[in-house]
Swiss-Prot record:
Entry EC number(s): 4.3.2.1
Protein's name according to its UniProt entry: Argininosuccinate lyase
Gene Ontology biological process terms in this record: arginine biosynthetic process via ornithine; L-arginine biosynthetic process
Pathway: Amino-acid biosynthesis; L-arginine biosynthesis; L-arginine from L-ornithine and carbamoyl phosphate: step 3/3
Keyword Lyase: yes
Disulfide bonds: none
GO MF annotation: an example: argininosuccinate lyase activity
Reactions this protein catalyses: 2-(N(omega)-L-arginino)succinate = fumarate + L-arginine
């Protein structure tokens, strides 16, 4: 049997927990990440206890001095958890008592439970973590924007179903990856509105009878308000699930970008060359240059999706209020942040270092009869109903396929035989440059529209960067 050393409970028990229970309960291997936030919250709690008349000025100052010393030692690594410490809270209380003595150190726990304490610390940690992640996402967006700006007129094959569809600008495609990532950052900004609610003062579930001021401690800790319901405040982890979703969505968006890079860098496509610093080789095949960053991004998306679904499964069917199941809420979220902080700078570097073969992309852009839609729309502009225009353009494709030529290589007689409306003037739209320039609706792939889109992406990026600094 173990002793009760390192725990914040025990008076009701005749002995300590079994070794197996102690090992199962221990959480310092992951919740130590909350230690700096725990000390910060303890400082605010000491002030609130003083305001409530539960500490003298001398006791308050003594606790604050002890907490300052503890914070310094936690920061430089000279203080850490012992094997006997059950969790971060127990370890830090031990550290405080070592510095100020058991009488003064033991007063700090008044009016708070680990239930409201950990819910508060988790929110504090997450609010900082999502900002770091958002900054990394914006760096990937900046890399996409820089590549788009560097290739304002480069044309590539646009795909649907991974089949040739219509010519588009490379910049248009790159910016299409930027927008989902910007929406992810917008989700982070919006998430903070709900995360900025302090559970502190809720106690175990029913609130406090000691005259504490939850609003004051919320303000001291940088929250916008205190929780309206103490049961909800201690029992709910929807904020963690929301963050886990955002992280998973970021990973999915990165995975789609990564998939494009993997395909584009293949010999068969040959759209991009990977920079040596952002790719790897093979242990047996000397010629290989592998897109490992992109492949790891694709793989890690599954990991982050798993973190989200695992957390949701943990949360379902828990009765109110707090349950020990909630010890399992932090590791998946912590892991998602760790993975994104590894992945985002690597993806930004990969994207920024890509070398595009714009001549090859342009040469492949008309392949697969991607100008067929332009033929149909040209006929519409001549007054032909779209149904008939679609049939005529399809027939032109079939004729070109039979001859193994491009649409632009069909003779005037062949075009006229398909439809009398297909006059030689249709050749005006049978170029990839003409096709791209013609699609000048808002959001379209015409160069002037894509230039507008780049400006919009940069404006949104700047706005979000400013909002994250608040």
């Amino acid at each position: 049997m173990s002793t009760n050393q390192g725990s914040l409970w025990g008076g009701r028990f005749a002995g300590g927990p079994s070794d197996a229970l102690a090992a199962l309960s221990k959480s310092t291997h992951f919740d130590w990440a909350l230690a700096p936030y725990d000390v910060t919250a303890s400082r605010a709690h000491a002030v609130v206890l003083f305001r409530a008349g539960l500490l003298t000025e001398e006791q308050r100052d003594g606790l604050l001095a002890g907490l300052d010393s503890l914070a310094s030692d936690v920061a430089d690594g000279s203080f850490g958890p012992l094997v006997s410490d059950e969790d971060v809270h127990a370890a830090l209380e031990r550290g405080l008592i070592e510095r100020v003595g058991p009488d003064l150190g033991g007063r700090l726990r008044a009016g708070r439970s680990r239930n409201d304490q950990v819910a508060t610390l988790f929110r504090m940690w997450l609010r900082d973590a999502v900002r770091r992640v958002a900054t990394g996402v914006l760096e990937v967006v900046a890399a996409l924007g820089d590549q788009a700006a560097a290739h304002p007129t480069a044309i590539m094959p646009g795909k649907t179903h991974l089949q040739s569809a219509q010519p588009i600008l490379l910049a248009h495609h790159l910016l299409a990856h930027a927008h989902p990532l910007l929406r992810d950052v917008e989700r982070i900004v919006d998430f903070d509105k709900r995360a900025a609610v302090s559970p502190y003062g809720s106690g175990a579930l029913a609130g406090s009878s000691l005259g504490l001021d939850p609003d004051a401690i919320a303000a001291d800790l940088g929250f916008t308000t205190a929780a309206d319901n103490s049961v909800d405040a201690t029992a709910s982890r929807d904020f963690a699930a929301e963050a886990a979703f955002i992280f998973a969505m970021i990973a999915v968006d990165l995975s789609r970008l990564a998939e494009d890079i993997i395909i584009w860098s293949s010999t068969e496509f040959g759209y991009v060359t990977l920079h040596d610093s952002w790719s790897t080789g093979s242990s047996i095949m000397p010629q290989k240059k592998n897109p490992d960053i992109a492949e790891l991004a694709r793989g890690k998306s599954g990991r982050l999706i798993g973190n989200l679904t695992g957390l949701l499964a943990t949360l379902k069917a828990q009765p109110l209020a707090y349950n020990r199941d909630l010890q399992e809420d932090k590791e998946p979220v912590f892991d998602s942040v760790v993975q994104l902080e590894l992945l985002l700078p690597a993806m930004a570097g990969l994207v920024g270092s890509l070398t595009f073969d714009v001549e090859r992309m342009a040469a492949l852009a008309p392949a697969g009869y991607t100008l067929a839609t332009d033929v149909a729309e040209w006929l519409v502009r001549q007054g032909v109903p779209f149904r008939s225009a679609h049939e005529a353009a399809g027939a032109a494709v079939r004729t070109a396929e039979e001859r193994s030529v491009g649409l632009e290589e069909l003779t005037d007689d062949e075009l006229a035989a398909i439809s009398p409306e297909l006059t030689p003037q249709v050749r005006d739209v049978l170029t990839i440059e003409g096709s791209v320039s013609a699609r000048d609706s808002r959001g379209g792939t015409a160069p002037k529209r894509v230039a507008e889109q780049l400006q919009i992406v940069r404006e949104i990026t700047a706005r979000l960067g400013h909002e994250l600094m608040r």
